């Protein structure tokens, strides 16, 4: 039996060896075709190989037979597939791909939908060739600076002729574009949906032309529009008022001329007004009965009182409200907003330390706004009375920030730690808290993930260490001085010598990594630089005194 098995294995090995020798001959035949041309006979046996054929790619053996170079797979890809690949690349990679061949250059230009250009006066010479290559642009950004002459009306209209499918337009620092340029541009680009202007030279006529021509406009942002003066005409509503969802006005001298547009935008969802002069109470009173779909309101440094807040409270669907440095707003206006806007989720208040918004308004917020998830109080002085009401009633409160408050101490912080169960992020800045309040966070707020403490002199590194031991997964970002800062008065002669501030020691105590903020780095660097300069000044003064005493003794 063993002899039979051995003879059988020996025959099998012999067959395998014969096959290997035959296949080697076929490989030699494939690798050295020049020998066959000299009359050398080829092997009769040739191993059959299964060839793969793709419905998209042709048979590679037929096209590459006898070729020494590897087959180019990408050449057989359709333009649509290559365009999809290019869309997933970065701008730098797209530039490199455009240098490969003319076909890639054409496809790269066709798949570019966003184009950002430096809008100088010499751009007009390259507009035809530039937009012939990039003929599928839907988002266009034109930027210029004060040092150079910007793009003119003729060049601006020339661009619109070649970009009729444009949906987004952003102009920054283009004072040479006038009302005529905007009118000509909007005649050719009627599909605009998002428009943003900053530091441009056109005025009311250009804005009205935009609103009357681009009927599908959804977002409008205007900043420092120089053509709108004190005696400007009214803007809007226009045909685009029905489709507008976002309006943002920044740093306008006569922003009240947009009142017809605001009152005519029935579907307006987001309203942002930043640092615009003039009385806004009348504007909001005209808007209150006509616009009811507003969800988000941002108001910063504008002249508005409780009358304006009362008018805005008619929009019962408001979920986000930012009141930043509006000193004429008081607890009365905030209470009316809280009573009528019960869906409020985010509330940011910067009281500018005027003490006009405090416990009374915040208690009303706690009473009606149960869905509150984010609360930011800057320059407001809440006490335990209002904070306890908020953390007890607003059970979904996840983010809380208390900055620049003189009344938020350890008592208030202990109340937050005890009753704010859903809190995930806490920020305390420039408040009179100590290590006792920080220790209380270790026993409360079970869902807390991140704590940020800045410019709180009573908090030391020891308190942060103890918090880390109790809550290992908690990220703590601490910016506390090692030694108490000596306060000094500043008189006519400048800062006194004893008013030396020591640089704070930045301590980050996470078990999970956390990047420190750039502002804290810059402030710490400035403090170190000031301390070193003062130390050098003192050393120089001592050297001078020593040299004088030596000269006198001699």
From Swiss-Prot:
PROSITE patterns: FBOX. Residues 71-117 form the F-box domain. It comes from the Eukaryota. InterPro entries: F-box-like_dom_sf (IPR036047), F-box_dom (IPR001810), Leu-rich_rpt (IPR001611), Leu-rich_rpt_Cys-con_subtyp (IPR006553), LRR_dom_sf (IPR032675). This is Putative F-box/LRR-repeat protein 8. GO terms for molecular function: ubiquitin-protein transferase activity. The keyword Cytoplasm does not apply. Keywords: Leucine-rich repeat, Repeat. LRR repeats lie at residues 119-144, 148-173, 174-199, 205-224, 250-275, 301-325, 326-351, 354-379, 383-404, 405-428, 430-455, 456-480. It comes from Arabidopsis thaliana (Mouse-ear cress). Transmembrane segments: none annotated. The gene is FBL8. Pfam families: F-box-like, LRR_6.
């Amino acid at each position: 039996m063993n002899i039979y098995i051995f003879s059988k294995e020996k025959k099998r090995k012999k067959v395998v060896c014969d096959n290997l020798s035959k296949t080697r001959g076929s490989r030699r035949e494939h690798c050295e075709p020049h020998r066959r041309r000299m009359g050398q006979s080829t092997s009769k046996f040739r191993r059959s190989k299964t060839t793969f054929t793709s419905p998209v790619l042709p048979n590679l053996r037929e096209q590459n037979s006898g070729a020494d170079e590897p087959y180019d797979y990408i050449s057989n890809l359709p333009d649509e597939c290559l365009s999809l690949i290019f869309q997933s690349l970065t701008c730098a990679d797209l530039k490199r791909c455009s240098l490969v061949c003319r076909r890639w250059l054409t496809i790269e230009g066709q798949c570019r939908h966003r184009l950002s250009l430096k809008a100088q006066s010499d751009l007009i010479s390259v507009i035809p060739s530039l937009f012939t290559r990039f003929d599928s642009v839907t988002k266009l950004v034109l930027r210029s600076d004060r040092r150079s002459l910007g793009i003119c009306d003729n060049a601006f209209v020339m661009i619109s002729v070649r970009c009729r499918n444009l949906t987004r337009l952003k102009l920054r620092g283009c004072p040479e574009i006038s009302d005529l340029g905007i009118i000509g541009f909007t005649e050719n680009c009627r599909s605009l949906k998002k428009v943003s202007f900053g530091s441009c030279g056109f005025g009311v006529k250009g804005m009205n032309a935009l609103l009357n021509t681009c009927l599908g406009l959804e977002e409008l942002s205007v900043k420092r529009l120089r053509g709108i003066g004190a005696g400007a005409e009214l803007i809007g509503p226009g045909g685009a008022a029905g489709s507008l969802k976002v309006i943002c006005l920044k740093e306008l001298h006569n922003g009240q001329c947009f009142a017809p547009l605001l009152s005519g935008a029935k579907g307006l969802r987001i309203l942002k007004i930043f640092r615009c002069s003039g009385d806004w109470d009348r504007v909001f009173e005209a808007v209150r009965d006509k616009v009811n779909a507003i969800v988000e309101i941002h108001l910063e440094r504008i002249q508005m009182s409780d009358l304006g807040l009362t008018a805005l409270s008619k929009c019962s669907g408001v979920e986000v409200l930012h009141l930043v440095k509006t000193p004429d707003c008081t607890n009365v206006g905030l209470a009316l907003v809280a009573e009528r806007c019960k869906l409020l989720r985010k509330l940011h208040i910067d009281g500018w330390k005027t003490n006009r918004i405090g416990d009374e308004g915040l208690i009303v917020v706690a009473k009606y706004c149960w869905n509150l998830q984010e609360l930011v109080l800057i320059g407001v002085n809440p006490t335990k009375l209002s904070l306890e009401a908020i953390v007890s009633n607003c059970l979904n409160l996840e983010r809380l920030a208390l900055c620049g408050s003189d009344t938020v101490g350890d008592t208030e912080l202990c109340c937050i730690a005890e009753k704010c169960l859903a809190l995930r992020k806490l920020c305390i800045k420039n408040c009179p808290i100590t290590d006792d309040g920080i220790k209380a966070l270790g026993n409360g707020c079970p869902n807390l993930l991140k704590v940020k403490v800045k410019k709180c002199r009573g908090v030391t590194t020891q308190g942060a260490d103890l918090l880390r031991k109790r809550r290992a997964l908690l990220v703590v970002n601490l910016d506390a001085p090692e030694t108490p800062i000596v306060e000094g008065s500043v008189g006519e002669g400048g800062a006194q010598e004893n008013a030396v501030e020591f640089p704070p020691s930045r301590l980050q105590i996470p078990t999970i990594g956390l990047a420190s903020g750039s502002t804290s780095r810059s402030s710490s660097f400035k403090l170190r630089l000031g301390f070193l300069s003062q130390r050098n000044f003192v050393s120089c003064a001592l050297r001078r005194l020593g040299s004088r005493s030596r000269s006198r003794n001699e």
